[in-house]
Amino acid sequence: METIVVVLMILVCFNFMMKQTFRKRGSVAAIAVVAALFVGLMCPYAIQQSKTQIADWLADAQLMLDTSVVLTVEVALQMAFCMLAVHVLTTGPVKKRTLWAYRALRWFPGILIFPVLFSGLVYLIFSFPGVSFSLVAWSMAVGVLILISVGTLFLRYLLPEKELRLELLFLTNALTAILGIIATVNGRTAVT
């Protein structure tokens, strides 16, 4: 179960980074600053977590179902962005409503990146015992700021074609949806 959650978290991070490749550098920088501030300011809440509490959360079926709903909504929005982006790229003039929906979805960075960043912060705090919690949090915040900014540029360089990035974003979101369904089952199978 924990392995599936870790793979889901990696996919959420990758999807977030891929989505940033469709935005302008200024908005990527703004999102990077927001994510870095989130990591730095979550230190007081992250130090209150315990490993047993996190294990209990992963074992809580109702919490996993609630998280799966949020994951499904985010994946649906990201896939809708991919389909609208292809529609805008391939057709001539588009309706204003379609263009408005495309722009709104392009600006939606995703909300699951924040729980993933929080989880990463908790993991780092547990990994560095004896080190100041705020030092760990703000060091991770600087790392997040640099990683989002540089990682987005690297992905644009690595995949310069917008269509290829859209296809990859769509496919990784589909994989995220499938893994979300698997994680929701949480060891319960329908055996009759």
What are these model-predicted stretches?
Residues 18-36, 159-171:
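Alpha-helical transmembrane segments and their helix-start/interface "positive-inside/aromatic belt" motifs
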Residues 29-55, 115:
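A generic, lipid-embedded transmembrane alpha helix
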